[in-house]
From Swiss-Prot:
The keyword Disulfide bond applies. This is Fimbrial protein Q. The gene is tfpQ. Its main location: other. Belongs to the N-Me-Phe pilin family. The pili are polar flexible filaments of about 5.4 nanometers diameter and 2.5 micrometers average length; they consist of only a single polypeptide chain arranged in a helical configuration of five subunits per turn in the assembled pilus. Keywords: Disulfide bond, Fimbrium, Methylation. It comes from Moraxella bovis. It is found in: Fimbrium. Signal peptide: none annotated.
């Protein structure tokens, strides 16, 4: 009598089914992880802008996106000379909320470009009050798959 060598077809089919079930469970969790890590990354990239804004204000200059037109302005480094966001996860970066004329203002980044489709369109806002205190808020209403768990530590919705 010959001994069996290898696997039967049914055994291989069972293994493939198990792998398929595990992949179906893992993929959505992985997508959520990617969305949160990308959101956290953009908050970190805006932190560099916050530091540059504080430094410009300390020197008596007006923070600006793009090349400074004169000695009273300071480029905070979040955009290229062409005006596009340096980060491949941001579709736009803006200065608003008074443009730091009195020390208060906002840095706003809209997620887009290479950001995960679930978070594209969300707006991350770093707001500075006149005393120099920064707060982070995220508006995910424009993002098609936004979930509250994408909000990184230190920010609020």
């Amino acid at each position: 009598m010959n001994a069996q060598k290898g696997f039967t077809l049914i055994e291989l089919m069972i293994v493939i089914a198990i792998i398929g079930i595990l992949a179906a469970i893992a993929l959505p969790a992985y997508q959520d992880y990617i969305s949160k890590s990308q959101t956290t990354r953009v908050v970190g990239e805006l932190a560099a802008g916050k530091t540059a804004v504080d430094a410009a204000l300390f020197e008596g200059k007006t923070p600006k996106l793009g090349k400074a037109a004169n000695d009273t302005e300071e480029d905070i480094g979040l955009t290229t000379t062409g005006g596009t966001a340096r980060s491949n996860l941001m579709s736009s970066v803006n200065i608003g909320g008074g443009a730091f004329a009195t020390g208060a203002g906002t840095l706003e980044a809209t997620l887009g470009n290479r950001a995960n489709k679930d978070i594209a369109g969300a707006v991350i806002t770093q707001s500075r009050d006149a005393e120099g205190v920064w707060t982070c808020t995220i508006n995910g209403s424009a993002a098609p798959g936004w979930k509250s768990k994408f909000v990184p530590t230190g920010c609020k919705e």
